[in-house]
Amino acid sequence: EAAELKKSGNVQELVVMGCLSERYPEELKNEIPEIDRIFGSSDHRQIVSFLTGKEFSKDDPLFFRSLMTPGHYAYLKIAEGCDNGCSFCSIPLMRGLQKSRTIPDIMAEARRLADQGVREILVIAQDTTSYGWDFDKKVYLSDLLRELNTIDAIEWIRVHYAHPAHLAQRIIQAMADCDKVCSYLDMPIQHASDPILNSMRRGLGQEGIRDRIHRLKTAMPGLALRTTLIVGYPGETENDYNQLRDFVEEIRFDRLGIFTY
């Protein structure tokens, strides 16, 4: 449709960006010759320079991010890509392996957001709990949370997209210790049947997930827990489904998202 608009003169340039262009740039060029520019999911600097006509500089106020959210909160991405290789997910193919941002870089953005009036930081990545593992000298999500907790103007820090297999005790303890970290966690478990979890390559069975939840709620009484599940996964039997249903009834998640495969 956009290509037709360009042919008719209603669109000056056709630009494609995101996961699709990251994975299939050559195929897009061949299939849609009207495309002028292709950007991958990590080409932020090139995109900004293309839009402004100016060379990107992260210290230039022109390039400070604009908020896409209401002014009191903002998402703070701490890493891009994923090393997990879950069988149902193509993120490593689309976005590559994990590339963590340094703590000083993240802190600089968080302080700029605070100066803009942001009071709640939502920490995100494909897997926040494996943050920093890709550095030669490893750092951990726990280290980052303790640093973010020192920013005076930030009042709340909310952690999203924790992987239960990577939820180390050091992270749980940091969440409990930091007064600005909300008693809330978004931790997708995907399923609760061991055969399905194994097929999904999740790295943790039902008992391990139960243990992580127990440790979380022991450290943070009143914790609000959100999760997501996949039903209808290939090979899922009625018994697998019933195990999942029973686990959900047992845990009583505060928020629950369910997707069909």
Which role fits each region the language model picked out?
Residues 153, 252-253:
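Conserved N-terminal phosphate-binding loop of PLP-dependent enzymes in the Aspartate aminotransferase
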Residues 12-18, 23, 115-238:
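Conserved SAM/AdoMet-binding glycine-rich loop
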Residues 1-131, 170, 185, 207-214, ...:
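Proteins enriched for Cys/Gly/acidic motifs involved in redox and nucleic-acid/cofactor modification
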